[in-house]
Curated annotation (Swiss-Prot):
PROSITE patterns per UniProt: RIBOSOMAL_S4 (PS00632), S4 (PS50889)
Role description: One of the primary rRNA binding proteins, it binds directly to 16S rRNA where it nucleates assembly of the body of the 30S subunit.
Signal peptide extent: none
Protein name, per record: Small ribosomal subunit protein uS4
Species of the source: Methanospirillum hungatei JF-1 (strain ATCC 27890 / DSM 864 / NBRC 100397 / JF-1)
Quaternary structure annotation from Swiss-Prot or TrEMBL: Part of the 30S ribosomal subunit. Contacts protein S5. The interaction surface between S4 and S5 is involved in control of translational fidelity.
PANTHER family on file: 30S 40S RIBOSOMAL PROTEIN, 40S RIBOSOMAL PROTEIN S9
Molecular function per GO: rRNA binding; structural constituent of ribosome
Domain S4 RNA-binding residues, every copy: 108-172
A Pfam family reported for this protein in Swiss-Prot or TrEMBL: S4
One GO CC term, this protein: small ribosomal subunit
Keywords: Ribonucleoprotein, Ribosomal protein, RNA-binding, rRNA-binding
């Protein structure tokens, strides 16, 4: 265990730094989701790695015949957490956790949600709006593009009250409306 007051890496770098297929896939994700660099892809992969590891541990506990109540509680906690975040459907199973893709994790980012819900013309513009404080969730300004939006918060995304973009006559809002048609 490290010192809690010190920041640590939240990602692991690839074991093979010059693997062409991985580089092309990461580049595609960076372009498609408007990410700043490949480190953001690695962070998303790290989060998925954590979920998959927990799912494998639950499956191992089931196969060894451990306390069934404890196994069910852990399973319900993991699946419930992923359902609240919007990554799994209501009738999901532990196998669905193992089948998660990095795109599903990246789709839950605030930057992606702002772009997909039509608040920005591109993922890069969505990132800019977020960092400049133009986007709020439930009336609370959020300035972190990598913020994971839960399924409940998804409907509460809007322009911040103090942002000039709140006005429908703002020139950028009109450009966004033209692109949306």
């Amino acid at each position: 265990m490290g010192y809690p007051g010190k920041n640590h890496k939240q990602y692991q770098t690839p074991k093979r730094p010059f693997e062409l297929s991985r580089i092309e896939e990461e580049t595609r994700l960076v372009i498609e989701y408007g990410l700043r660099n490949k480190r953001e892809v690695w962070i998303a992969k790290g989060a998925l790695r954590k979920y998959r590891k927990a799912a494998r541990e639950i499956i191992a506990l089931q196969s060894t015949g451990s306390e069934q109540a404890r196994v069910e509680r852990k399973k319900d906690e993991l699946i419930g957490s992923l359902q609240r975040s919007g990554m799994l459907s209501e009738n999901a199973d532990i196998d669905d956790v193992l089948a998660l893709k990095v795109e599903q994790q990246l789709d839950r980012r605030l930057q992606t949600q702002v772009y997909r819900r039509g608040f920005a013309r591109s993922p890069k513009q969505a990132r800019q709006f977020i960092t400049h404080g133009h986007i709020a969730i439930g009336g609370r300004r959020v300035t972190i593009p990598g913020y994971t939006v839960s399924a409940k918060e998804q409907e509460e995304i809007s322009y911040a009250g103090s942002s000039p973009l709140v006005s429908d006559i703002h020139s950028e809002r009109q450009r966004i409306a033209k692109v949306g048609r």
